[in-house]
Amino acid sequence: PAEWAAHPQGREVAARPLLSRERLDEAPPRRRTGPLRVLDLTRVIAGPVATRTLALLGADVLRIDPPGSPELPDQHADTDVGKRTAALDLERPSDRRTFDELLDSADVLVTGYRPGALDRFRLDRPGLVTARLSAWGDYGPWGGRRGFDSLVQVATGIGVTEGSPREPGALPAQALDHGTGYLLAAAVLRSLTEQDREGGTRLVRLALAQTGHWLTHALPRYEPERYLTESQGPLGRLRHALSPVSYEGGPSSWSRPPGLAGADAPAWASQA
């Protein structure tokens, strides 16, 4: 932990807030008449956890992956609950047109690639709420680097804290991914509320390294069983965690189990 605190990237992370939310322009408030439309360009855990949470709350979440690069089966079963998934090649003109039409009618865009990786696709739209997830943030000497939970755990000193004198260790779960995913969903909801009231194109940014910095503080212990449930669907019977989002009158679980990866049409639910 001390080495990370002294590292230039560690100092950049420590000097910044846990997450950032920005208003980019004076676009008018959007008048939504149907379910919230969320376009999901994320992979593995953190981003998919965020969009899974939005799906729980009633959003129409459509995940887009490149053809031939499906999500890992276990990750798909865990994090694509409540969503539909489709494949589009954004380098193909016909697929790009389909994607642009989806983006034009989306309320939220969530991306989970390294900073700058998707810039060539011109993903900005007036009034859109965009949430960008990265490993290290888009600042500091590591700002443009790729990364994932386990690497960030080691870099930030969690590997030392959880390890032994002989070798580094790790948290018993990808806690940075899951924590960042839920924080991202909460930040999107706040930005949507502000967009509804005040207008403006909105940008949310989070990084696994920021969550790691936050989670290194002591957290209370708990018993996991009361947070688990089971569901039946096309992938069989799944045992999984309940959503951490709960409120009186709200949903207790997702509206649909994960289906077969990529089996849905690239269209919003009302048009499929």
Positions of predicted regions on the chain:
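Short glycine-biased active-site loop of nucleotidyltransferases that positions the nucleotide triphosphate
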Residues: 31, 77-78, 142-144
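Hydrophobic alpha-helical scaffolding
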Residues: 89, 108, 141, 145-148, ...
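Short amphipathic alpha-helical "interface-anchor" segments enriched in bulky aromatics
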Residues: 147-155
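Flexible glycine/proline-enriched surface loops and loop-helix/loop-strand junctions
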Residues: 166-174
